Curated annotation (Swiss-Prot):
Chain's gene name: rpo6
Record-given protein name: DNA-directed RNA polymerase subunit Rpo6
Molecular function terms from GO: DNA binding; DNA-directed RNA polymerase activity
GO CC annotation: cytoplasm; DNA-directed RNA polymerase complex
Keyword field contains Nucleotidyltransferase: yes
Length: 106
């Protein structure tokens, strides 16, 4: 990565943070490790209880619900809503697909 590319990425991140602060948009503009773990765990439980996988099991190469859930998350196929609590006590609801799309633009 060149210096100019790095500076461009930093500027994009600064713009996202500024929007989040000024417009109360969601921040951080990515899934946290705790949200990722919660989503994978919840989806793996659904799969273990008999829900239909959203990916072809042959492509994943395993019937393990955790691996299937990880692949579904990686492909952006899950339709979850993330609830984030703000320090002022308000809650923010964010669609997982929107958050993944924003994360990919950074």
């Amino acid at each position: 990565m060149t210096t100019s590319e790095l500076i461009e990425r930093i500027n994009k991140l600064i713009d996202v943070v500024d929007k989040a602060i000024n417009k109360r948009e969601f921040y951080p503009p990515r899934l946290t490790k705790y949200e990722t773990a919660r989503i994978i765990g919840a989806r793996a439980l659904q799969l273990a209880m008999g829900a239909q996988p959203l990916v072809d099991i042959q492509e994943v190469g395993s019937v393990d619900p955790v691996l299937i859930a990880m692949e579904e998350l990686r492909r952006g196929l899950l339709d979850f809503i993330i609830v984030r609590e703000m320090p002022d006590g308000k809650t923010m609801r964010i669609r997982l697909k929107e958050l993944l799309e924003l994360e990919r633009t950074l």
